[in-house]
């Protein structure tokens, strides 16, 4: 994935938003909560209406008139730069989906101030950078936010409140933190864990991490699947610090193998599969996430992790690295 300086700026934003939302609670007091916030709902609103990897016929029919066609056309023009999936994404997805979605801003002026702040940071780090495209995207975001807050968000919020209550009732009973810490040997150090529900984009990427303790999800999925994925994603977040460097290393490694096979999915698939594997172990049964990754070879990876575990390998990072190498060996590749 080609990176831009705005991707680095987006990383800086996620660090700041993590700090803002992290209450630094001790292990025994950690809460996992479902929340409704306008920012992530606005981002998915734009992504859905413009068709940037998200679609929702019911939502689009209801709200397509809330954004000018010319503005949607601007976003569509840069679809490849804004879309994301399977651990990859366009160079501006980090800024305009993940960073903006994880921020807090009360109106269009606050949104503009946030974007201007990080645009200045980008220009200081790389003087003379062409900002034409991000400026055009930012203008669409700023110009349409106040109208969204007035005409769309109140009903969208109301639509999600019943599911929010159901999720929080069950999340209070769940023991995800203790279960995952016991299974992995890792400790959670990022305070309360936030699930941000979004109304638009029924067909599109869900479970998108916005910072170290904040995730996002389409609100109205199968309840059993949603709870299984809440556990799955907490595992991803818990293991992220140890596996992220290996993930990047393996992305580079698989690209250099000199094969015509598409291996871009392997590092992502191995990580999702590892979380599925632990989730099954924690639950003592096959959980609903196990067969939900259509583009990941989860069953093969889980068999590999079974074998490595039987050899006495328990550390998630070691399971991940060795699991990828064994998977590549099955494909006739790697060392």
Question: What are the language-model segments listed below?
Answer:
Residues 22-108:
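N-terminal mature-domain "stem" immediately C-terminal to a signal peptide or N-terminal signal-anchor/transmembrane
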Residues 1-24:
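Bacterial Sec-dependent N-terminal signal peptides
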Residues 241-271:
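Post-HEXXH active-site segment of zinc metalloproteases
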Residues 196-227, 240:
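Active-site scaffold of zinc-dependent metalloenzymes
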Residues 152-209:
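Auxiliary, metal-adjacent structural segments of Zn-dependent hydrolase domains
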Residues 287-335:
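Pan-zinc metallopeptidase signature
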Residues 77-177:
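Long, mid-chain structured domain cores
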Residues 227-245:
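Active-site recognition of the HExxH zinc-binding catalytic motif
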